[in-house]
């Protein structure tokens, strides 16, 4: 899809979708507890892939298509192994199959996809989570099903640590106990998943785009007090529900990024909150004369795109000052962005970055790959139009 996006001042209230990070985990845990889960209206593509894959647990020799969903693939590989579904073949987009998966799982790449060569074993797993924590989450959900106990030993500090915390808290919600140890986790075997109410939370990584737009619009208003754009956040069903981007669950409203937006620090470490790179980079790009260094970005090169490079390319094309290094981005704010032609790099979060940047630019932006938002936020363009964003489809 090729879109032409025109500078627009957004007005109104937008409701963000539910957290797909939390819903992935709930779909799996509820399935293991014998529960069914109704998907939300217009579910993200990643959620549809996980739901469809779980349905294939009941059929012989399934081909499990994961699309571009790293969560679906890395969460479910250990689960299928634990349940003895060794006749399954996992496949997905070419980019997904290039993303890191530990050799310890014993997968066999074939022309058809990834095949499982052995059941999941209990015992000690020594893993690195420096590139992704998703396989660790997958093991945390699968190992309790085995008869014997297991330990996970992490060889270095994991990235996206709050997502591991989310996994543990969802497991606890379903009666599965995982003990954190100094070097990783201890998991008792022979555990049973317990039915429990569905946990929900807003997708803060999606909300961050609108919150940045609202703040920049407010900054551009005389006096800096008028705010025409508001973000409505769905209430959680449990007080201690973890939030999707890994911040403290007690935060409310726009306080998820308030700390950044109030006074952008010189250095922002994104190791634990990687999905905030795109919206915060846009915000930093529009703070004239201020330089912000985003660190902990190296592992983002193995996401749906090489995200640090994609962010740098999109913002540079639109007039921002960006310096790219192996593990960091350095952005010096400018007074405004201009129009241009950019690409989503096949990445939903880059497409949303480009869309928001276009609203704040001084000329139209042509975006190739606008359909990528369906991966996490299918209604993104619809919501933008409802808020007054002018969009034109040049090529479906």
Regions found by a protein language model. Give the residues of each.
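Structural preference for solvent-exposed beta-strand-turn elements
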Residues: 1-396
């Amino acid at each position: 899809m090729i879109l032409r996006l025109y500078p627009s001042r957004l007005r109104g209230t937008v409701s963000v979708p539910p957290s797909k990070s939390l819903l992935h985990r709930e779909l799996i845990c509820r399935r293991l507890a014998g529960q069914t889960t109704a998907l939300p209206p217009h579910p993200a593509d990643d959620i549809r892939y996980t739901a469809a894959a779980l349905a294939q647990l009941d059929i012989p020799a399934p081909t499990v298509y994961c699309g571009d969903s790293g969560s679906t693939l890395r969460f479910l590989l250990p689960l299928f192994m634990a349940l003895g579904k060794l006749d399954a073949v996992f496949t997905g987009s070419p980019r997904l199959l290039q993303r890191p998966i530990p050799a310890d799982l014993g997968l066999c790449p074939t022309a058809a996809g990834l095949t499982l060569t052995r059941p999941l074993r209990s015992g000690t797993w020594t893993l690195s989570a420096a590139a992704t924590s998703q396989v660790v989450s997958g093991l945390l959900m699968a190992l309790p099903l085995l008869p014997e106990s297991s330990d996970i030993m992490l060889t270095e500090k994991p990235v996206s640590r709050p997502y591991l915390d989310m996994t543990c808290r969802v497991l606890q919600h379903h009666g599965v106990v995982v003990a954190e140890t100094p070097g990783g986790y201890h998991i008792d075997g022979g555990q049973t998943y317990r039915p429990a109410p569905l946990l929900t939370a807003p997708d803060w990584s999606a909300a961050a785009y609108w919150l940045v737009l609202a703040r920049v619009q407010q900054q551009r208003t005389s006096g800096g007090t008028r705010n025409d754009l508001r973000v409505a956040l769905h209430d959680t069903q449990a007080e201690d529900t973890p939030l999707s981007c890994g911040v403290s669950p007690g935060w409310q409203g726009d306080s998820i990024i308030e700390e950044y937006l109030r006074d952008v620090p010189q250095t922002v470490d994104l190791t634990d909150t990687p999905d905030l790179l795109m919206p915060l980079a846009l915000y930093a790009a529009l703070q004239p004369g201020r330089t912000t260094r985003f660190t902990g970005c190296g592992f983002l090169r193995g996401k749906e795109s090489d995200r640090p490079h994609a962010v740098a390319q999109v913002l540079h094309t639109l007039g921002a000052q960006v310096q790219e290094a192996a593990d960091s981005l350095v952005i010096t704010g400018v007074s405004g962005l201009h129009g241009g032609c950019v690409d989503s790099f096949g990445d939903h979060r880059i497409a949303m970055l480009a869309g928001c940047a276009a609203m704040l630019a001084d000329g139209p932006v042509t975006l190739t790959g606008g359909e990528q938002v369906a991966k996490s936020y299918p209604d993104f363009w619809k919501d933008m139009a409802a808020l007054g964003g002018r969009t034109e489809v040049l090529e479906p």
